[in-house]
Amino acid sequence: MDAEAEDKTLRTRSKGTEVPMDSLIQELSVAYDCSMAKKRTAEDQALGVPVNKRKSLLMKPRHYSPKADCQEDRSDRTEDDGPLETHGHSTAEEIMIKPMDESLLSTAQENSSRKEDRYSCYQELMVKSLMHLGKFEKNVSVQTVSENLNDSGIQSLKAESDEADECFLIHSDDGRDKIDDSQPPFCSSDDNESNSESAENGWDSGSNFSEETKPPRVPKYVLTDHKKDLLEVPEIKTEGDKFIPCENRCDSETERKDPQNALAEPLDGNAQPSFPDVEEEDSESLAVMTEEGSDLEKAKGNLSLLEQAIALQAERGCVFHNTYKELDRFLLEHLAGERRQTKVIDMGGRQIFNNKHSPRPEKRETKCPIPGCDGTGHVTGLYPHHRSLSGCPHKVRVPLEILAMHENVLKCPTPGCTGRGHVNSNRNTHRSLSGCPIAAAEKLAMSQDKNQLDSPQTGQCPDQAHRTSLVKQIEFNFPSQAITSPRATVSKEQEKFGKVPFDYASFDAQVFGKRPLIQTVQGRKTPPFPESKHFPNPVKFPNRLPSAGAHTQSPGRASSYSYGQCSEDTHIAAAAAILNLSTRCREATDILSNKPQSLHAKGAEIEVDENGTLDLSMKKNRILDKSAPLTSSNTSIPTPSSSPFKTSSILVNAAFYQALCDQEGWDTPINYSKTHGKTEEEKEKDPVSSLENLEEKKFPGEASIPSPKPKLHARDLKKELITCPTPGCDGSGHVTGNYASHRSVSGCPLADKTLKSLMAANSQELKCPTPGCDGSGHVTGNYASHRSLSGCPRARKGGVKMTPTKEEKEDPELKCPVIGCDGQGHISGKYTSHRTASGCPLAAKRQKENPLNGASLSWKLNKQELPHCPLPGCNGLGHVNNVFVTHRSLSGCPLNAQVIKKGKVSEELMTIKLKATGGIESDEEIRHLDEEIKELNESNLKIEADMMKLQTQITSMESNLKTIEEENKLIEQNNESLLKELAGLSQALISSLADIQLPQMGPISEQNFEAYVNTLTDMYSNLERDYSPECKALLESIKQAVKGIHV
């Protein structure tokens, strides 16, 4: 068999409508058990190692091309329809079972000499199974089997080895049929196979198997698609005049009555029937055709119906492939990278919380990931506790590849833990169960509810009863197979999945010091979510919740929850108890709460008055809405498919985690504008009525869990719950670590965030009243809480002491309230700062004189009626304490800035007036000064004209000087050239007259050169004289010597 046979699934080449295949699958699986599967199961049981047959949902081979297979399927059907139309004879199916492996093919070729009587028995059984197809059409049950998470937290399915060992194909080969004794039972391909090797059939059918709950050697044949995708059937070819030889059909009535005993020899034998000649086969086939004609017609009709169903599935596969091709490629790469980086704890790790005596899971490699680091120099001091890059001294040398590789490894191994609420509040350094609040919660649950595990009154999970019926149904459908007892299977599953509810209210009371709330069974609320919106981001969600109990559904499939739901809901409930302590999970109360939102709760979170003052008061009267119904409109009755988990304090199902991740991410800012349900204080103030109403509200058919009623004292009911006054704060992250003792904004991490958000909304009202002050440098450090001049550095520097003016003194609001008092004689001595009757001598005098008839004094009446702020025009709003009766100074008044500005303007006007009155006294002096100014201006003009003339003369002289300087330069250059020529001539003359000596003179030289020249000039100038012949000869010789000199 070539490589293409491994990638193709079963097909049929007839026409018709779809028919259920459950009965056919069951009979064929009983008839043809896989010897190879038996051999592998025996080996695995001998070794004692569980076989990991799960494969990722997204792993598929590189040759994944459903379009080509779909086209090939259509072409095969077109070619096969031709002989059916041309031949008028009724055709019978020739069956040959093709193994999926080359080893099985070789076994089939060796066993090609099987006996004819056994072949006829097989043919008889095949026809009988096809006849009963119509009877089981209404009995096909669509069941869903949930899967546990694989190593990376994504749903795992069956591996392709099951498909290769348990699938068979049927075809014809020129009238000769070959039967293999090791034919595997027919099974449907799961979702993993439709993504990997059976992708050309378009994700047609799926079967999710649970390794823990599957009985040994009992194959399950279920459909998980709500669209009723049909299973693929053996491929059958029909030919014109050739029919199947069915010898000894009438002689095998005992085998017809007991097909299982009849199949014992074919399954265990090693020989294959040898066939007679072609002529004998044709004659016997004609005989069988006349007897079994009607049965074959029914079988052919049923197979034609199956062919149409498979054709529809092939077309659907093409559409699914085009839609999810890119998504599968991306998720495949992400999954491969994640599996290389981390090893997530699976169901084996979860048993640690179920059974305290279970062995600890295998530790991960506790080596520092940085190359060349042996653990020395770390912050922890020991590298077995150092499994990340943080705290390593060699962190600077880490290449980018290692940083990217260990980016997602640093997760908390606790299922459902996102790193929040740890002891060190950093999940990057939290890689173990120590310090994890969810792990502590589950350990506390085991110790508290140990007695409830053994109690027979514990309510059974609906899925356990469902599994019991499922095991019984499998036992009824396969009577000849040896399976384990239903009680043993259910008890084993109860160990793995049946967890006892955990009281998180008592956990809050012990760990966080919180007074426990009412322990009642809350009403169920499952928010409806469309099936198409289940986990829209399957890449981001597993990183957020590494091992959460939510199922990642394949696209286009309906979501359902089955066997592992109780275990998953337990982890989700534990995660919800911790996540409720986070400031970013306030929507969880909306999901879990079964009371609708009241009108007053919308504005109860943040109250800001018209001047922008934040009311952080603890003593507020909250009106309870007693007529609020207990359940909302979307309350759903629990079903085995949804399987919500009910605890004694809260109710959490998988939809809660879905809503928590879809509504708001961890990194998004808190939205205080959302409306919330009733707070814990409102729930606590009316506990008795809620207890009675919740007991009366019961759902039909619901398994009730007894919850004891706590005895609540009257003073505990009336006592107000002391919570943090910051809106949106649940007490986590305070400096004290316990919000029960935290009754103010100091030490709250959300106080600054809340005030900044309010400041952004009410920036004008919350500004510092000092002009030019932006709030920086205050004593409090935050101008959002600084609305007065106290603590402002600019107010101290630029502030001016107020001196009351006459108008302010005459203002009646600034006077003493006692009638007739002008402020004199007060204790303070200044009536401007005395605005009450205390310290007034007239007040004391009149109080003595007034008869004690119960009537109050006039100033007391005025004070009660008009207790205004002493600043004019201020009604007391906007002060720091928001109570102007206790406000007896200007500090904290927002209108004080206007008074300061007014004081500054009055001082400027005063200085101007002083300059005006103390300066010039008369107009004459002003006129005299004006005349002097005019004279000075005229003299200035004259001087300026003279200056202009002088400037022109200076410029002309400067130009002349420049020209003279240039001429001097030229003369100097000429002189230098002449001196050079003179020097040259003197040297030439000295050299030429060196031999001639004048009388009475020595030989010519530089020292006597001038004298020598003077004598020569005198001699030549007096040529008219009569010289002696000697002198004449001397002159001639001198002339001859001088001829060589050129001037």
From Swiss-Prot:
The lineage of its organism: Eukaryota, Metazoa, Chordata, Craniata, Vertebrata. Zn(2+) 1 binds at C368, C373, H386, C392. This is Suppression of tumorigenicity 18 protein. Residues 550-563 have a biased composition (Polar residues). The gene is ST18. GO terms for biological process: interleukin-1-mediated signaling pathway; interleukin-6-mediated signaling pathway; negative regulation of cell population proliferation; positive regulation of transcription by RNA polymerase II; regulation of gene expression; tumor necrosis factor-mediated signaling pathway. Zn(2+) 6 binds at C869, C874, H887, C893. Keywords: Coiled coil, DNA-binding, Metal-binding, Nucleus, Repeat, Repressor, Transcription, Transcription regulation, Zinc, Zinc-finger. It is found in: Nucleus. Repressor that binds to DNA sequences containing a bipartite element consisting of a direct repeat of the sequence 5'-AAAGTTT-3' separated by 2-9 nucleotides. Represses basal transcription activity from target promoters. Inhibits colony formation in cultured breast cancer cells. Zn(2+) 2 binds at C412, C417, H430, C436.
